[in-house]
């Protein structure tokens, strides 16, 4: 069951009820939570485009708590983060794994954060194939191209060289918030809205 809380705001014109995500959107906050899939990507992309059209001079705040998911859906979000004119501040809370780690790193440099007890996990893309040998070969070539692309994005975002990224994504590589800062995936640890370590 997916329960979405409602908040009530009072103004001179009366009361207005919002679902919590709509209320957060008013403050330019986007929540990336759960598995990255096409439906989630479409919702995140629409919110990014809406907030950028509303005011491209103000930051967009993207809070991330996700195990990752679809590479194509994640890349659609990644491309939109880079497409919009507004700076996108990323804040990891809980976990940013797999494709979600790419999104955390894709925030505007200098504005990529994690809460103190967050984890970031990078690894190579996962995939499977079945069918005739030619289909399996095509799928294998595609996943190798995808790995090369994702690793280049991580290298560009972190400042690590591609050989280091290739080695470090060979297996699941879990990092604390501080390790992710040291690695270059994020820029700081956010203790609260005002205190950044």
Curated annotation (Swiss-Prot):
GO terms for biological process: protein quality control for misfolded or incompletely synthesized proteins. HAMAP family: ClpP. It comes from Ligilactobacillus salivarius (strain UCC118) (Lactobacillus salivarius). It catalyses: Hydrolysis of proteins to small peptides in the presence of ATP and magnesium. alpha-casein is the usual test substrate. In the absence of ATP, only oligopeptides shorter than five residues are hydrolyzed (such as succinyl-Leu-Tyr-|-NHMec, and Leu-Tyr-Leu-|-Tyr-Trp, in which cleavage of the -Tyr-|-Leu- and -Tyr-|-Trp bonds also occurs). Belongs to the peptidase S14 family. Its EC number is 3.4.21.92. One of its GO terms (cellular component) is cytoplasm. Keywords: Cytoplasm, Hydrolase, Protease, Serine protease. This is ATP-dependent Clp protease proteolytic subunit. Pfam families: CLP_protease. Fourteen ClpP subunits assemble into 2 heptameric rings which stack back to back to give a disk-like structure with a central cavity, resembling the structure of eukaryotic proteasomes. It comes from the Bacteria. GO terms for molecular function: ATP-dependent peptidase activity; ATPase binding; serine-type endopeptidase activity. The active site is at residues 98, 123. Cleaves peptides in various proteins in a process that requires ATP hydrolysis. Has a chymotrypsin-like activity. Plays a major role in the degradation of misfolded proteins. It is found in: Cytoplasm. Its main location: cytoplasm. It is an enzyme of class 3 (hydrolase). The gene is clpP. CDD domains: S14_ClpP_2.
């Amino acid at each position: 069951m997916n329960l979405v809380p409602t908040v009530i705001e009072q103004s001179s014109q009366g009361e207005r009820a919002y679902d919590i995500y709509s209320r957060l959107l008013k403050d330019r906050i986007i929540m990336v939570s759960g598995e990255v899939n096409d439906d989630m990507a479409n919702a995140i992309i629409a919110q990014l485009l809406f907030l950028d059209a509303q005011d491209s001079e103000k930051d967009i705040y993207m809070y991330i708590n996700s195990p990752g998911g679809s590479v194509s859906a994640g890349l659609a979000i990644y491309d939109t983060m880079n497409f919009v004119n507004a700076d996108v501040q990323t804040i990891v809370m809980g976990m940013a794994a797999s494709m979600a780690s790419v999104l955390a790193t894709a925030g505007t440099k200098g504005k990529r954060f994690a809460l103190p007890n967050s984890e970031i996990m990078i690894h190579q893309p996962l995939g499977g194939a079945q069918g005739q040998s030619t289909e399996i070969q095509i799928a294998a070539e595609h996943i190798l191209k995808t790995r090369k692309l994702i690793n280049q994005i991580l290298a560009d975002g972190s400042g690590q060289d591609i050989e280091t990224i290739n080695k470090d994504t060979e297996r699941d590589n879990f990092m604390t918030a501080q390790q992710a800062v040291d690695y270059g995936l994020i820029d700081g640890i956010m203790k609260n809205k005002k205190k950044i370590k």
